[in-house]
Amino acid sequence: MPTAIITGITGQDGSYLAELLLSKGYKVVGVARRASTVTYERIEHLLDKITVVQGDLTDQGSLIALIEEQQPTEVYNLAAQSFVPTSWNQPALTGDVTALGVTRLLEAIRYVNPKIRFYQASSSEMFGKVLEVPQREETPFYPRSPYGVAKVYGHFITINYRESFNIFAASGILFNHESPRRGLEFVTRKITDGVAKIKLGMGKELRLGNLESQRDWGFAGDYVDAMWRMLQQDEPDNFVVGTGETHSVQEFCEIAFGRVDLDYKKYVTVDERYYRPAEVDLLISDPSKAGKVLGWEPKVTFKQLVEMMVDSDMKRLSAKAA
């Protein structure tokens, strides 16, 4: 039975990846930081099937001990300080976890067993001020936030360990991916939660930043399958994972409010407080390599994704109201 370690298992991607690996017969070990309140809500339904251990990407010793104890076949590094606005408030912490944390994990693998396969969650935020449209594996990076900068470091240190120590280290450059498990601080979930509140009489308006902002949005449940496929190849490589389509925040609002028969124009207010200090440009992926090499393609459409998220928030808040 293969064993996989997932850092960031309590997050959106960690929970979907854990489900996928369990369905494939893996033993799943999740790593969570020691905190006074650990939120297990995304993996609550899995707690009897997985092992959750404490570990910290800022502590080299804890990572070596973790890898020695669990002897994994695969390690998926999904842990990060991943909310872009927070990376401006905590730039050094973002670097310590999101950048140096990758080095510490790779060092632990090199020290304990260099045959372990490693997946690094890279991000489309690395493209930032984009230098070509659409973005592919060879597109140069120009990150526009401390988070994006930290992810560029993590991406290149992964390639360095692959080339220098012959470690099977793959990097997935994932474009925005959402789900009903997305954190409420992210704009997509903020919208669907806001729509449900307005529909159920719990709210009157939704304040958002730049409605023109465009992203390539996909479903997180589809994207974790691409991660797994990367570690099943003969050779490690980098892959862009996205839908190849772009949509604006305004379009997201139209579909979300439309799902509950409301007109977004009556409820959405633009608030400049929510604008980013430096906005990224047109992020749109060219996922053709992932299609060719991994046989991967997204299954859930943009409209299905938005409606799935609205339905989930309606159900959650209706139950609370009852």
Set out the residue ranges of the language-model regions.
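NAD(P)-dependent short-chain dehydrogenase/reductase
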Residues: 130-134, 144-146, 152, 156-232, ...
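Conserved C-terminal active-site "lid" loop/helix of NAD(P)H-dependent oxidoreductases
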Residues: 220, 272-297, 315
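Small-residue (primarily alanine) positions within well-ordered alpha-helices
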Residues: 79-80, 154, 226, 285, ...
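N-terminal Rossmann-like NAD(P)+-binding domain of SDR-like oxidoreductases, especially those catalyzing
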Residues: 1-177, 231, 300, 309-315, ...
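C-terminal "lid/loop" region of Rossmann-like NAD(P)-dependent oxidoreductases
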Residues: 206, 210, 237-239, 247-254, ...
